[in-house]
Amino acid sequence: MIISKFGLGQQIRHKLLGFPGVIIDIDPEYSLETPTWEEISGNDTPRSEPWYHVVMEDNEGQPMHTYLAEAHLMKEELSEHDHPSLNELAEVIQRRAPQLRH
């Protein structure tokens, strides 16, 4: 059984880039068809660990959808950032999370 470190609606931060984000979906392992796993397998990211669909804001505050391995994420400390749109998205997802886990 694979256990994810982060949950739906949780605010996180990209370890390398520092971008803040909100988890909108979780896959127990890498599950995208494009790009293929072979195209990204040059890095040391494990395919069999949880992967997350994350909405992040770049340096200019623009939203972007990303697909990231658990190893690339760290818990966000709420007092560290000021991103109202991410705060709102996190609240909406957390309120609806019980309905999403059917």
UniProtKB/Swiss-Prot annotation:
In Gene Ontology terms, what is a biological process of this protein?
response to heat
Question: Does the UniProt entry include the keyword Ligase?
Answer: no
Q: Which UniProt keywords apply?
A: Cytoplasm, Stress response
Which positions carry the signal peptide feature in this UniProt record?
A: none
Q: Which InterPro entries match?
A: Hemimethylated_DNA-bd_dom, Hemimethylated_DNA-bd_sf, HspQ
Cell location: Cytoplasm
* Similarity annotation: Belongs to the HspQ family.
Name of this protein: Heat shock protein HspQ
Species of origin reads Pectobacterium atrosepticum (strain SCRI 1043 / ATCC BAA-672) (Erwinia carotovora subsp. atroseptica)
Q: What is the lineage of its organism?
A: Bacteria, Pseudomonadati, Pseudomonadota, Gammaproteobacteria, Enterobacterales
